[in-house]
């Protein structure tokens, strides 16, 4: 494969070693032209969409290309943990199976099917409150035209005030650099008009929703407001909530 494909495989392998598994989607289609029950393998060279989610739990760079129902362009396969039980009624129903590195549905550059997911969760009691705008209908990704800012305003309603320890943002690209700033009691229409309490540089390696611990905890009193402002020097893709 290309250098980019090799790099992508290495990143996925690193995440499997770190987290134990990855979530992916691929196109599952029954049929002897795709399934090889003798080798518990699957390879579909023609479909770029997806219809089924599975977990990637390992890999074998030397898995023979001949061990697929149709010979793949090269050796190598991901070890997949499926959710359809252990009964051997087809390779994709045998608990685990091998998915070719070259399967079209996990290599499309035209859709989001190349995404792999991990969930790095924290303890539920790590924070007392989550300040958020909830209830929207879905998410979309916007890509800016050059440098940009993203911000939001929050009001402190807790009696006794609040201590802000972390903020969050959704990013739709790899290797993103930005400056994160927190402003206290900004004026309406200008979220950077308040008192600057904190500014820190942030690097986000992977796309997704990230919780960013602040370099210092910030205290607010009931009735205060604060603005969270991200500044990007270059074009950036952001996850944005939407109601329509």
What are these regions (language model features)?
Residues 2-75, 79:
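Active-site-adjacent substructure of cysteine-protease-like catalytic cores
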Residues 28-31, 59-64, 83-88, 174, ...:
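Acidic glycine-/aspartate-rich tracts in secreted/extracellular proteins
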Residues 34, 87-96, 186-195:
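Acidic Ser/Thr/Pro-rich low-complexity disordered segments
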Residues 60-62, 66-143:
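Conserved catalytic-core surface of thiol
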Residues 105-192, 196, 218-223, 232-244:
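Beta-sheet-rich sandwich/jelly-roll-like modules and their strand-loop junctions
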Residues 193-205:
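Solvent-exposed serine/threonine-rich low-complexity stretches and specific carbohydrate-binding patches
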Residues 208-210:
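Short strand-edge motifs at loop-to-beta-strand transitions and within beta-strands
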